Amino acid sequence: MLNDYYQNIGMKGFIQRYGIVNAVKRGAFMFIKLHLVKDYEVRKVLWQERASTKIKPYLKYKDTDVEGLSFPENDVENPIWIYWNKGIEQAPIIIQKCYESVCKHSNQKIILLNDQNLADYIRLPEYIEKKKDAGQIPMAGYADLMRFALLEHYGGTWIDSTVYLTDPIPDMILNSDFFAVRNSLLLIDNPVLYPAWFLHAKKGNKTIREIRNVAFAYWLKNEHVIEYLLPNLIITLVVKSNPEVEKAIPYMNSDYSEYLVKVLADDYSEEKWNWIKKLTGIHKLTYKLSPDIEAEGTFYKALIENSIE
């Protein structure tokens, strides 16, 4: 199982991510054995639902534009946005392969952001920069704010650096006013239904503006995340507050996009690879892997060595 290859963030990282209060609450809810709900995944959804109720009051800020946010003048419009803070040359090899796949399968202009060129496109409010420098806003949270603001101002497609493409992005997505992948849990009312790892929006889109405003309002008033999937909570709340917007989003199930990452440690099979590519051309991977996954003959090794197309 791929879960065996994930690198754990440890207790120090857990507290740094959530803050002491949120870490204690989340840890107690998720891991105390006396909990009535024994299934971990169900318990996680219940925690996310609880977190969602804490975020919902911030919807009142969805029409309040962000102060201190600015953009240098340039002629950028509707590009693909990718961010790796230290530059792609310093990224793990799997990140580099993901970037190469986007270049191969995209006709849009691709803007590869890093900490050196970020100010050429966006300048975040001073309170955000201070909280980031103090370690209160994690890099993932910082990137969330960045993606929402960039998409609202310039439009385009945000693709996480861990996304691997095997086909061009469908026109149905590129022609939509707003798009997000859907995390389907069948009959469960999923509080993190819409993830942030692949988003598309037209310049000035109202939905992405509301998402941006709610996200910045949260960080104006908080110093830690209440839930790691905070952006998913915000996107889901905003989208569900407008049924017509949700109805217009082209349907794409994340189950298919998250299948390749589950078999990276498996023995490579051309038949299975062709099947995976038929399911979807957009694959969400991860760089948080143990070196043990680099065994010969695996899907991971084939991907890294460019031996699969």
Set out the residue ranges of the language-model regions.
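Active-site acidic Asp-centered loop
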Residues: Y154, I159-D160
